[in-house]
Structure formats: structure tokens, C-alpha cells
Amino acid sequence: AERRQYAGGVSNGSIGFSAMDYALKDSVGAAGISARKFWACYGDVVVCLVANLQAKNLHEPVYTALDQCRLQGPVWVNHEMQELPMGDHHLQNVQWIYHAGFAYIPAQPSTIDLQLKSVSGSWTTINASEITTPLQDKILLPVLRHGSLPASFAYALAYAKSAKDAKKLSAKPTWQILQNDSVCQAVSFPDGTVMAAFYAAGKIEAGKKTQVQVNQPCLILLQKDKLYVSDPKHSGSSVTITINDTSLVLTLPADGTTFEKQVQQEK
């Protein structure tokens, strides 16, 4: 196993995001997987970014499970008038999936394996002290398949009243991916809110009037005249953040908690 230093989050109490430099290796370190991962929560939407996904000495396909839950009604994919039957489905060019009030929306049309079926198991398989009685239930399990690596990708999980609304949200998302690579993962929302995870010194264009630059790794949430920052490396060091022409030097808490600062943005 491998534990990297970079992990943290930022919140203003109602919205926020988490990010981490993720790595997983086998017991001898011969095989493993790594990626930069980012989850932004804003209203009824969670935007998920994965950058620089890499695998070493793996002989099985690499995939991301978008969800795994009890099946709670009909499932629609790309067409709001056509329900998907039970079974194992290998789906190409997926733009959206709708189930039980939720829309699953990949940033680009994607290949997804979707399980709609009954499965069985027992709690004792994950905890020896639990009961051995077999349990059975129907599940929904959408799995995003990845092709050649390294790769970067994104998807969103959003509340939607109907399959028709899921289709509309896929066509006109309420979020914009500003950057998704090994240096920075960032998204913005219609009110100008920006959430950005910097893994190194860098700069992003966050709309026509906002430019954000940092001199070292940090997590930033910018909403109107408030800046929220944290230190994902938990070092307690100072960071210089430049918003347009205004530079701020901030000493961040070493425990990774959010630091709040009033800022003045161009109108």
C-alpha cells in the first residue's frame, strides 16, 4: 500500500470540494494504480474529476464505478422514452443515465457497463463477526471503462426529476470544467463560483474576468468576495495567491482546515 501526502478539502459550510493524490499498490509493490481525484459538491450536483490515471503491471481492465445501489425503479440511457431491461449491458456513446431521481453524466460520451440484476452475498464476507445468512437484492451498478492509459476523465452525479430533465442537464450542464490534469483540477458554476485543486504552482482562467494563480499546492474555493483556502499537504506553510492583479500571502493551518479571506473581485 502507498499513502501520498496530498489529501484535503475546502468548504464554506454549504458547498465545497475534496481532492487527493491517490495511489494503491499490491502487497509487494509490483502492481498498482494512481490518479489525481477531485469531487466538487454544489447544490444538487457532484462533479467528479480524475486526472493522470495510470496503472502499473495490471492485467485486468481499469474501470471506475459511478455508483452501486439498490435498484429502485426504471433505468433510462440516452432516451427518455425507452426503459432499459434487466441484465448486463455493454453500452457505448453513453451521454446520460437516469435512475430514481439521479442523473449520471459523463463529460464525454463514454463506454459504460451497466448491471441491472439480482445479486447475493452475506455480511460475513466483509466482517467475520457478522451473520452468514445469504441476502439477495437487485442492484444498479454503472461502470465506466477506461481504454489506454494514462487518461483523464470526468463525470457528474446530479439530482433530476425525470429522464427528460437528465437529458436537458446533459445537453446544458450547470458546471464547467476549467482544467483537469496533473497540475490542476478545477470547475466553475453559473454564479461565478470556482473550485480548484492545485497540485503544483499554476494558473487558471476562471471566466472572462477572473484569473487565479498560486505558487504552490493548495485548495481554493472562490465565491463572490470570499476566498476559502486549505493546505492539502498539511505543512502549515505560506502560499501566495494572485486573483487578477491582487496578490495575497496566506499562512494556512497545518491541520488542513479552511482559511477564509475577504477579497475584491473585478465587477
Role assignments for model-derived ranges:
Residues 82-141, 203-206, 211:
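Trp/Gly-enriched beta-strand surface patches
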Residues 1-87, 92, 101:
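Catalytic and substrate-binding regions of extracellular carbohydrate-active enzymes
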Residues 31-38, 139-142, 213-214, 220:
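Active-site-adjacent structural elements in folded domains
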Residues 4-11, 39, 89, 95-97, ...:
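Short, exposed beta-strand/loop patches in secreted or surface proteins that constitute
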Residues 74-89, 126, 248-267:
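Solvent-exposed beta-strand/loop surfaces of large extracellular or lumenal domains
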Residues 158-267:
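Non-catalytic terminal regions with compositionally biased, polar/charged low complexity
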Residues 2, 7-22, 26-29, 123-133, ...:
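Edge strands and adjacent loops of beta-rich recognition modules
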